[in-house]
Amino acid sequence: QPKRENALVIGYGTGNSARVLHDHDFARLDIAELSPDIVALANKHFGDINGLVSQKDNVDMYYTDGRNYLLTQSKRYDLISMELTSIWFAGAANLYNREFYQLVKTRLHDDGILQQWVQIHHMRPMDLLYLINTLHQEFRYVWLYVIGGQGILVASNADSATNLYHLDGTAVAGDTMLTETEKRLQEGVLLTPEGVDYLAQTLRNPTFFVSTDNNLYLEYATPKGNAVSYDAFAINIGMLEKLQNEAKAILIGDSEGQIMPESITAPH
């Protein structure tokens, strides 16, 4: 995100994510954390990692539920970043449902970006497809990065989000070399917007594969991922790579046919 006036972090954790944004020169940083004890313990035991970011002059702490915070104020952000606990924890799915993403859109600037951690392990393939497709219902451009075994969803409705930027926010020119860190980040892209678009097509009726406050699909489905007998991480990676490769084949006119849900979903 080249525009770095203000950002919101939902979930403090160890505080490292908030520190990264602070160190990358966001002018203002808001943090919404449900538990004051989390912040106190993180600063006590991980202060050398988070740099006590919660105490910085340009950082405001809000001890409240992240979704309620967005609901009860009208600030708009350049970036909203979320790295919560696993979806299957009670209540966490409220920040992965369609209504939440609708709310997030109203709290982002027109060129704003949502960044959200998503687990790839202990996640049944169909549940992961639900999650990605739910986000895509509200955001035109969606990427999935997998770095260090962790998934990160990046979403925006701005055409400018498809441009490539350096970590310092400057645009990548044709003759500009990426740093080694930036190259590793680019190598971590597992699904591009074209791949996510193709995913929606394979679902036949994408509006059905959506988790909402009314059906609570992710709330009740994701806990079952802890009991599967197969390697969910490996199967999910393979499924998503297959989707992305098929999407690329269609773009270059070299596809033998669509991958339908029954062929991309593993045991669930």
PLM-predicted stretches and their roles:
Residues Q1-L8, T64-R67, T72, H122, ...:
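Soluble small-group transferase modules, centered on the S-adenosyl donor enzyme superfamily
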